[in-house]
Amino acid sequence: MHKFRYSLHQHYSKRNSSDKSKDSPISQNSNEENDSTKLSSSSLQDLHDDLDDIYNNYTLAQGTNNNSVDTLDSENNQAINKFIDKPPAIHGMEPQLPVMHVSSRLSSLGNTTNETGESIAKSAPGTPLSSHSFDFRPHHPRAVTNSSLNVLLDTPNVSSEFNHLVDQTPPNESVERFDDSNNTVDNTEEEENNDDTDEIPKSETLKQNEENWEKKGAAVKTIKTMDGEMKTIRRNVTDFKFGKELGEGSYSTVILATDKITGKQYAVKVLDKRHIIKEKKVKYVNIEKHALNRLSNRLGVISLYFTFQDKDSLYFVLDYASNGELLTLIKRYNTLNEECTRHFGAQILDAIKYMHDNGVIHRDLKPENILLDDKMRIQITDFGTARLLEKKNDESEEYPVDVRAKSFVGTAEYVSPELLENKYCGKPGDVWAFGCIIYQMIAGKPPFKATNEYLTFQKITKLQFAFSAGFPTIIRDLIKKILVLQPSRRATIPEIQKHYFFQSVDFKDFDSIWLSDPPEIGPYKMTAKSMMKVPELNKAPITTVIKKNVKKSTNSNSNTNNVATAVGGSSSNGHKGSSPTPEKEPSPATINNKSTEKVSAASVAAYVLNKPATNQNSSTSEDSSKRSSNSNETRKLSYSQQDYIPGTNILRPQISTRPSVGSYVKTTPSKDRKTLTKVPSNIHQQQEKVKPKVMEVKPATTLEAAWEPYLTHPDERILRIGPVIAHKEPTEPFEKKNKASLHISPLDINKEQRSRSNTSLLTQIVNEVNNNTSELKKVENADESLAIIEPQYNMKRSPTSDSKKSMDIERSASTSGSRISKKAIFKKLGFSHLEKNDSEESNGPSLTEKPQTCTLVVTTHGRALLFIRNDIESNYLLIAEIKLKYPFIHFQELVISQTKFSKLVPSVGVFVISSIDNSLIFEVEKFEVNQWTEALAKSKYNEIGKR
């Protein structure tokens, strides 16, 4: 029941004129205005009469149509709403009270009057039915839009009109007149309208208003026909038949629609005006429209045909891509083969170039925004976050390369590092996303993927990505040139087009890129061809070295030319182990004259090693030449064949050819012959210079003085010291559990530590193993106990380590054997507490049982010391010493923290010192991880450089 609100004051004051008020509501209003008599005492009978009078006035009035909704005021006090279809009152019929279904939300609504005097409906604040929530929709809306789904509903949202019209059937006469005036309606439509009991009748004014919107918001396009005549095309909502929903975005819904005139299918993007303004998306809608206007009518980019609107929505009529998204294709096959990657990659690259040439930066390139049409050609869509560039000046036809970004846009896995760190967005950002897409086609997943956006951004800024086993070498080389942190060093579109991977693609031929049939689509399978090195990178540098040696040696001696060719690796004599014997030894004067020229150190060394001895026979010289050539070949192989991909036994691709050994030695003019006879000693100097540069010893500070008892050499200094939370786990299960989260760290080591012709850390470690074969012939045969020393646990067996290695370290066989056997017996019997004293002695702080708060000290002599103490007053206890010089000791960063604080405190970082059997895991602040791993790497290579 409605709450009838009526003023008793008005009815008591007009008690004397109650009879007149029944006949005429006008006289009643005059009595209400002129009567100012005060309330007087009355009997119960008078009150009863007044109530009857109220009821009769509301329900039994003749000749009037009382259309009140929430109040009992007469119709003269109501604001007229011209959008409500009110059936006329029929004389002689007594109107019945409508049966109302009142919800909890609509029952509290009332009519208010604005400045213009029109009635405005109110609903709960912030709901889609609230007309006061939006400034541009004051009254008479036609449709309700769900803000999350953006689905248009054919239901009015003015609540007062809803209260009046729901469940109220208009008279038969009006229905008949409506049917007579609309003879064009089909019978099927009449049946559907009759079945739809929830449909609300619309007034003629509302219908006329909608028709005006259709005309006013229609799209008008002028085209030129084949006959040369100009033809105007007009399209609006009624010209399309809408079908299934294709997808939805953040502020729009894409629906498949068919043009009723031509029968062509389009993808219509429906954008609700209310939601756009409420969510402040007007800017992005305008950007998308202007970007599509710049780029339409060209293969590779979705085309915009019409834009029109009605009272509630905007409509973008776009190309219909029947084969869906590129991401769906990748997920269907898990990966794509190299031919598909080349075909689609060339189309994407050509489309990006077209966008950039027209001053549009997409900024959100990803497989979800790349569609495939009916002929499997790519179409880039979703330009809502694009950046439109302005030309540098009025005369220039070029657009700037990058601009300052005021807002963060894009998807986490594909966003460029310069946008994260410097807030710059430009053309290199789209190239970065292109590299990520190429990677995803082959690997099946983006290169930078983590559990949340924060960790993903950390991976991007640190360039932490890895190639899966069997990743094609040529594509790997391409991605390495694209995924570069500095935009200025990143490969440009012309450089990518000239890459060996796209060698078979003619980017100048438009038809070969866009009109050729796509290759057979299938998953990527590793083949011998895919793992071959890039031919152009292998041939060019070697050829130049050979020419250089030939040119510089022909002037002095033809025999030296042959020797240089053998050293270069192109001659077959070098492989056979023989070299020609020089006919004549050059004089010192000749050597001095030629010393002013730049002579390759490798050719000089080869000449001296193959020079015949004066006091020896020819057989001795031949043997020495064989040994020298073989040593040169093995030295080259040791430097070129040991660069493996981390975690696999696959060689890393040789992106830049390594210079010869002689390039590391400064060539100086030789003054006498003695300098040439001492070349073998210079070779040892070359090997020493190849090693990392030793850090300069700085004066000792109070820090070294405090930790002097634990420093083994007067020159040993402390690189870093700080608190850590450490524990120990077996290496194999730990790496299996965190296989996808472990990454080699640090990635940005200084060039001084990577002085071996810019080789990787793993290559340096392997080369160090080859240089120290006297100590460790094989990494597999190395003993971890030499690298990780635990003084407090030599008499204690670690429950997680292998039994053989941990039981035999500095242990007395008789004592330890009896103790272990006694413990084992009592443990089986359940009386292990009898050995309480022994257990108390051995139960010190253990890194295997639970994480311990320790102090880690890293020194310049390749040592990492781990200390622990119970309280502040007690002394430090050395529980572990790690010698970092061994090749099986390496450092990693665990990207996904497994601590209990990972959900609450995302700043916790983890780094690992891994060995053969055990790994030490350290928890520190997130920003300290790179600092610790850099200190460990410096310590390691400083110790290696001194050897």
UniProtKB/Swiss-Prot annotation:
Catalytically driven reaction(s): L-seryl-[protein] + ATP = O-phospho-L-seryl-[protein] + ADP + H(+); L-threonyl-[protein] + ATP = O-phospho-L-threonyl-[protein] + ADP + H(+)
Biased composition (Basic and acidic residues): 199-212, 802-811
Domain Protein kinase: 240-502
Stretch forming the signal peptide: none
Regions of compositional bias (Basic residues) in chain numbering: 1-14
A Pfam family reported for this protein in Swiss-Prot or TrEMBL: Pkinase
Comp. bias intervals (Polar residues): 108-117
Biased composition (Acidic residues): 187-198
Keyword match ATP-binding: yes
Superkingdom of the source species: Eukaryota
Keywords: ATP-binding, Cytoplasm, Endocytosis, Kinase, Nucleotide-binding, Nucleus, Serine/threonine-protein kinase, Transferase
Phenotypic consequence of gene deletion: Sensitive to cell wall-damaging agents SDS and Congo red.
Residue positions of the active site: 364 (proton acceptor)
Enzyme Commission number(s) from the entry: 2.7.11.1
Primary location: nucleus
Bias type Low complexity, positions: 550-579, 618-632
Annotated stretches, region: Disordered: 1-43, 108-132, 162-212, 550-598, 611-644, 660-686, 794-816
Family the entry assigns: Belongs to the protein kinase superfamily. AGC Ser/Thr protein kinase family. PDPK1 subfamily.
Entry text on domains: The PIF-pocket is a small lobe in the catalytic domain required by the enzyme for the binding to the hydrophobic motif of its substrates. It is an allosteric regulatory site that can accommodate small compounds acting as allosteric inhibitors.
Name of the molecule in the record: Serine/threonine-protein kinase PKH2
Organism: Candida albicans (strain SC5314 / ATCC MYA-2876)
Gene: PKH2
